[in-house]
C-alpha cells in the first residue's frame, strides 16, 4: 500500500492527467485488499487475487491495473524506496486482456446525422456541448472536461489548453473558428459563474460511459467519443490538410527535431484548416447556405 501511495503522490499526481481515477481504482481494487501487508510479504498470489477479482467483470481493467502496479513498483525500486520484483514476469494476458484497438471512423452520413441530432437536442445540454466541440476541435475529452473559461481568448480567437490538462504535458494552441464562436460565447455566458466552459466537471468514467452508448440514439453501429477524434483526423487528411497541421490540432507531440521548429505554432495554417472543417460540418449538418456569402474578414 505504501509503495503504491508513494508512486501516486510522487509521480502520478504531477505526471498523469488521470491521477484521480487512478487513485480511486488502485484504492478500490488493490490497496484496500492488500495495502496493509508489508511489500516484502506480498507474494504474487496476493496480487493475483486482486487482479482476478477485477478480471471476472472487466478483464481490460485487470490488465490496466497490472501495468499500473508494475510501473509503480519499478518507480519505487529505482528510487530505492521499496524493492519488489514479483510482478516482473507477468503480462496483461496473464491477468486479463488488452483493450480492443478501435479503427472506427464515422462516415460522412453518420457524422451528418450526429450533427443534426445535436441541433435537435436529443442529448442533454452538457453532452451536446461536449460532443459538438469534440467534433469541431478533434481534441481529447479531458481537455474539454477540465476546460476553464480563462483558456478561451476571444480577442486573439485562441483556445489554449494548459499543459496540466494535456496528456502530453505540452500546451496546445487551437484557433477558434468563426463558425463556432456564437456557440462558445453562449456557453461562456451561461457558465461564467462556475469558471468552467461546460459548467461542471463530470468524472471521466461517466463521460466515457455516456459516450459509449450515444450511438444507440442514432441507430448507428457502435462508436465512442474517441472515435470522433479519429474521424476528425481522417477527414482533415481527406480535405488535404497538411499532416503536421493535423498533428498540431490534435495535440500529438511532433516527432524528433520537428518540435524545435514548432514555435510559430502554425496558427494561420491551423485557423485555415478549422475554417475549412467547420464549413464542411455546416454542409454535413444541412445548415450551410449554398449561396455566395461575403468572406469573413480574417482576424490577424
Identify the role of each PLM range.
Residues 1, 17-20, 31-51, 199-200, ...:
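A Lys/Arg-rich helix-loop hairpin that forms a DNA/phosphate-binding surface
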Residues 1-27:
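Short, aromatic/basic-rich helix-turn unit that serves as a nucleic-acid recognition element
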Residues 54-68, 78-141, 145-147, 155, ...:
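Basic, Lys/Arg- and aromatic-enriched nucleic-acid-binding interface segment
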Residues 84, 151-158, 221-222, 241-262, ...:
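Short, polar N-cap/turn motifs at the start of nucleic acid-interacting alpha helices
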Residues 116-127, 137, 174, 188-196, ...:
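Short, basic (Lys/Arg/His-rich) helix/loop patches that form interaction surfaces
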Residues 178-180, 185-192, 200-202, 256, ...:
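C-terminal secondary-structure termini that scaffold catalytic or DNA-interacting sites
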Amino acid at each position: 500500500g505504501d509503495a503504491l501511495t508513494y508512486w501516486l503522490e510522487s509521480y502520478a499526481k504531477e505526471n498523469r492527467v488521470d491521477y484521480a481515477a487512478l487513485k480511486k481504482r488502485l484504492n478500490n481494487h488493490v490497496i484496500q485488499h492488500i495495502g496493509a501487508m508489508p511489500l516484502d510479504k506480498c507474494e504474487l498470489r496476493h496480487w493475483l487475487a486482486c487482479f482476478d477479482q477485477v478480471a471476472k467483470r472487466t478483464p481490460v481493467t485487470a490488465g490496466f491495473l497490472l501495468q499500473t502496479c508494475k510501473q509503480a513498483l519499478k518507480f519505487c525500486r529505482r528510487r530505492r524506496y521499496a524493492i519488489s520484483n514479483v510482478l516482473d514476469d507477468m503480462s496483461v494476458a496473464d491477468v486479463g486482456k488488452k483493450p480492443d484497438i478501435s479503427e472506427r471512423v464515422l462516415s460522412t452520413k453518420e457524422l451528418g446525422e450526429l450533427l443534426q441530432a445535436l441541433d435537435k437536442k436529443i442529448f442533454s445540454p452538457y453532452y451536446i456541448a461536449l460532443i459538438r466541440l469534440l467534433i469541431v476541435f478533434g481534441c481529447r475529452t479531458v481537455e474539454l472536461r477540465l476546460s476553464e473559461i480563462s483558456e478561451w481568448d476571444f480577442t486573439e480567437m485562441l483556445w489554449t489548453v494548459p499543459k496540466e490538462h494535456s496528456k502530453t504535458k505540452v500546451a496546445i494552441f487551437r484557433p477558434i473558428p468563426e463558425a463556432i464562436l456564437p456557440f462558445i460565447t453562449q456557453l461562456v455566458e451561461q457558465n461564467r459563474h462556475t469558471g468552467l466552459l461546460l459548467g461542471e466537471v463530470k468524472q471521466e468514467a461517466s463521460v466515457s460511459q455516456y459516450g459509449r452508448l450515444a450511438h444507440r440514439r442514432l441507430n448507428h453501429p457502435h462508436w465512442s467519443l474517441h472515435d470522433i477524434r479519429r474521424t476528425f483526423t481522417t477527414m482533415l487528411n481527406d480535405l488535404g490538410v497538411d499532416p503536421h497541421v493535423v498533428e498540431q490540432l490534435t495535440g500529438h507531440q511532433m516527432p524528433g527535431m520537428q518540435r524545435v521548429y514548432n514555435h510559430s505554432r502554425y496558427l494561420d495554417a491551423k485557423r485555415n484548416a478549422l475554417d475549412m472543417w467547420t464549413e464542411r460540418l455546416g454542409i454535413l449538418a444541412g445548415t450551410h447556405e449554398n449561396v455566395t456569402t461575403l468572406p469573413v474578414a480574417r482576424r490577424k
